Swiss-Prot record:
Binding residues for heme b b562: 83, 182
Keywords attached to this entry: Electron transport, Heme, Iron, Membrane, Metal-binding, Mitochondrion, Mitochondrion inner membrane, Respiratory chain, Transmembrane, Transmembrane helix, Transport, Ubiquinone
UniProt binding sites for a ubiquinone: 201
Misc note: Heme 1 (or BL or b562) is low-potential and absorbs at about 562 nm, and heme 2 (or BH or b566) is high-potential and absorbs at about 566 nm.
Subunit structure comment from the entry: The cytochrome bc1 complex contains 11 subunits: 3 respiratory subunits (MT-CYB, CYC1 and UQCRFS1), 2 core proteins (UQCRC1 and UQCRC2) and 6 low-molecular weight proteins (UQCRH/QCR6, UQCRB/QCR7, UQCRQ/QCR8, UQCR10/QCR9, UQCR11/QCR10 and a cleavage product of UQCRFS1). This cytochrome bc1 complex then forms a dimer.
Function recorded in the entry: Component of the ubiquinol-cytochrome c reductase complex (complex III or cytochrome b-c1 complex) that is part of the mitochondrial respiratory chain. The b-c1 complex mediates electron transfer from ubiquinol to cytochrome c. Contributes to the generation of a proton gradient across the mitochondrial membrane that is then used for ATP synthesis.
GO biological process assignments: mitochondrial electron transport, ubiquinol to cytochrome c
Gene3D superfamilies according to UniProt: Cytochrome Bc1 Complex, Chain C
The protein's name in its UniProt record: Cytochrome b
Entry annotated with the keyword Metal-binding: yes
Length: 379
């Protein structure tokens, strides 16, 4: 028997995943974000690899090595800013991707959804550790504040913090291990993405109607490959505009000052994509309570399949639930704004109200509204 190219095991996998994959005929542009995240991950891996070739993970030379990359390495500034702003794009797409999953009820694919939440945690950990590497003021103090949160864990907390630091403060050992983890985690994320896709292809993709689409499937290529390429084109235009015109727009000016353990910046804050969680953390006066609220604000995503009480899967035909969904989005934008503000009146109160509202919408309003919609539709 002659060996056709499609009988090769590797080509077969690619073929079943990206070419002959049966896809619903009505999936909208919201479904583009999965492929955009894949491209973002590839871009981050590549730019990160080139940065690692010139970076030194030592407290005395880390800051200078980043400066050296920007000044002396051929197109080093481009690689550095593509990596920094690529992370911002990554999180924008992540939040859109999760939002799409909530809106269209994709969380009913529990295996895919849960590995997705774990992926979110892994990406957040990677981004946090990457932010520490340039060893600027905000890198150092961000690392100090966030790692210190673990000391709120009863009994083992303080020991755990010192164990993570590798000493009695954030220092050389901390920077070295953060670089090691920041380098290895994206490869673990890539493996998790493959598992994420494996679980998705077990069930097939969801679609905006939320109904079974087995009766109306089309091949992924050429229909959705072209659609994805258009999305990638838009992404690259946005990213390159950001990199070329305003590369520091989303960064913190404090990070252009080398780390100084003796001088605390007036406002310690993380990158913009963590501000909503940071606002929730700060809104609770108790340290342990704040840490629990912070963790639960992300872990709550795992409860969506359990809290789903509607007889319909998608929100496409549920106007009341749609209103709540957009209320949740507005609430998250308010939290993001508050996270970047100083801890003073009226921001403290606004942050506390927004934090309570966040949990209230997800845990109480959404499930009860879904039940009410069932009643209104006499289901």
């Amino acid at each position: 028997m002659t060996n056709t190219p499609q009988s090769h095991p590797l080509i077969k996998i690619v073929n079943h995943s990206f070419i002959d994959l049966p896809a619903p005929s009505n999936i909208s542009a919201w479904s583009n974000f999965g492929s955009l995240l894949g491209v973002c991950l590839g871009l981050q891996l590549l730019t990160g690899l080139f940065l690692a070739m010139h970076y030194t993970a030592d407290t005395t030379t880390a800051f200078s090595s980043v400066t050296h990359i920007c000044r002396d390495v051929n197109y080093g500034w481009l690689i550095r800013y593509m990596h920094a702003n690529g992370a911002s794009m990554f999180f924008i797409f992540l939040y859109f991707h999760i939002g799409r999953g909530i809106y269209y009820g994709s969380y009913t694919f529990m295996d895919t959804w849960n590995i997705g939440v774990l992926l979110l945690f892994a990406v957040m950990a990677t981004a946090f550790m990457g932010y520490v590497l340039p060893w600027g003021q905000m890198s150092f103090w961000g690392a100090t504040v966030i790692t210190n949160l673990l000391s709120a864990i009863p009994y083992i907390g303080p020991t755990l913090v010192e164990w993570i630091w590798g000493g009695f403060s954030v220092d050389k050992a901390t920077l070295t291990r953060f670089f090691a983890f920041h380098f290895i985690l994206p490869f673990i994320i890539t493996a998790m993405v493959m598992i994420h896709l494996l679980f998705l292809h077990e069930t097939g993709s969801n679609n905006p109607s939320g109904m079974n689409s087995d009766s109306d499937k089309i091949p992924f290529h050429p229909y959705y490959t072209i659609k994805d390429i258009l999305g990638i084109l838009f992404m690259m235009i946005t990213l390159m505009s950001l990199v070329m015109f305003t590369p520091d727009l989303l960064g913190d000016p404090d990070n252009y000052t080398p780390a100084n353990p003796l001088n605390t910046p007036p406002h310690i804050k993380p990158e913009w994509y963590f501000l909503f969680a940071y606002a929730i953390l700060r809104s609770i006066p108790n340290k342990l309570g704040g840490v629990l609220a912070l963790v639960f604000s992300i872990l709550i995503l795992m409860l969506f399949p359990i809290l789903h009480s509607s007889k319909q899967r998608s929100m496409s035909f549920r106007p009341l639930s749609q209103c709540l969904m957009w209320m949740l989005v507005a609430n998250l934008l308010i939290l993001t704004w508050i996270g970047g503000q100083p801890v003073e009146h009226p921001f403290i109160t606004i942050g506390q109200l927004a934090s309570v509202t966040y949990f209230f919408i997800i845990l109480i309003l959404m499930p009860s509204t879904a039940l009410m919609e069932n009643k209104l539709l006499k289901w």
